[in-house]
Amino acid sequence: MRRPWEPPAFGRALATRAQIANIMKSHLTGQSGSSPGGRRYHTLPAPGFWLLAPFRLQFAQRRTRNLALKSQVFNKMVGSYTLVQETEQEPPRLSPTLSLPTSFGSVAVVDQISSEDRPAFESGFRRYALDHRYYEITQSALGKQFEHLYLLLKDATGTTRAVQPFLLVHQDLVMGTPAFVRRSVEAARRVFPSFLKLPMIMVGCSAGEGDIACDTVSGEIGWTVDGLKEALPQVGRSLGAWMLVFKDYPKSYRSFLDLMVTGGFTRVPSMPATGMELNSRDFEDYLSRKLSHAMRKNLRRKFRKSAEGPPIEFEVVTDITPYAEEVLPLYQGVYQRAAQKFEELNVSYLSELGKKMPDRSRFLIWRIEGRIVAFASCIVHDGVLRDNYIGLDYAVALDRHLYFVTWRDTVIWAMENGCRYYHSAPLNYDPKLHFRMELEPLDLCVRATNPLFNVILRRLLPILEPTRYDPILKKFSNANELW
């Protein structure tokens, strides 16, 4: 039986037992240094650190590879500490990180898609707005924030029928709960710092809603769902995950995710997206038919105010690379103000999105006297404009009502370019309520890998799920659809 501090069987464990012992000593004793007399000393961590130390190590995955220098690199991966000799000539590692037998064949975990498995990966996500290219973009751009991996579901012949992306994360379970809940948890964390911060597998996308891969035989998701139901608990235990989570799946998946309940999963609402049909003749027709008199008056006052001063210029591009460095601080300003945070975009994400998905990516840019003051990152697919991320220059955003200006111009552009539906990412619900948008429920499907903990988790989830603490959500006409 593997001890918690030893490398997993599937790791490339080249470190010696002595090296592992030295690493364990430094990690489990906190900060270390030398006293003025030259004697080594160690600062002991809080007791809670010891309780979860093995799991911290299993998920402390920091890969650093320097191919140009052809040097030895310290590779820390899923609990194993390895010294790896890298060269420019060495091809990418495509061997399974983990392989397990199943009743339908086998399942393998890899961190890159081989040429043999690529057709299954591409066909499995072809019909979705976020296709295989988007998952590769997020893995490349956000790889330092989350460990991006792929689950290969193989049939009895060893042929890969479906490729399902997932993440390894260390997630705070009380994020999104009200202040009194967080204060209670923070009190416990003074003794147990990792209380309700658990290593988990998240099935889905690190920067967007989740989708389930279609299998190559039927072209549907039913076989994949059955395979995930059986394989995920085994994979989770092998990787040291405490929890398994299907992250942010649209309501259309409920009939399939509810099948996971028989496998010990619990479905709860996540923070929903919002949307509205674009069936008006133009924007003025939308204002007149959909919005209340008070809201129309309020918006028109804001638009008149925004028109004062230098004009606001509007442009749409498919590749924002030339402006990525300029717009990123605008996004970061919005990100820092957000009450809930998960992924954080960077220049690489913005640039790769435009270069690799020019057929779907649209970047909307607003300028004042040549300076970019706002931008929006959108995906257009199958008649739907997905308004995913926004950036605002708060030096002028409030005085010029940039949030409302950007929303108006985005909707007008969508109408004029054949979009039938406007989809907006979660949060900031108050203005969307007054825009007469409807909720688009997103679900979490959760299970603990430990059966006893799963019983406790089932009782905690209705308290921890974030939608119950947002009073604005209850005012939407279809709020009852959240569950």
Predicted features along the sequence, with ranges:
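Tryptophan (W) side chains
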Residues: W5-E6, W50
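N-terminal, intrinsically disordered, basic low-complexity segments enriched in Arg/Pro/Ser/Thr
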Residues: P7-G11, T406
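Short, low-complexity intrinsically disordered segments enriched in A/P/G/S/L with frequent Arg
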Residues: R12-Q19, I23-S26, S32-R40, L44-F49, ...
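Alpha-helical membrane-targeting segments
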Residues: L52-F55, F59-R62, G176-V203, T449-N480
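Active-site/acyl-donor-binding loops of N-acyltransferases
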Residues: F74, V78-F104, L168-D172, E209, ...
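A conserved beta-strand-loop-helix scaffold within acyl/acetyltransferase catalytic domains
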Residues: T97-S184, W242-L398, L482-W483
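Acyl-donor binding region in acyl/amide transferases
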Residues: E147-H148, K154, R161, L167-R267, ...
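Hydrophobic alpha-helix feature that most strongly marks membrane-spanning transmembrane helices
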Residues: Q332-A339, G354-P358, R371, S377-C378, ...
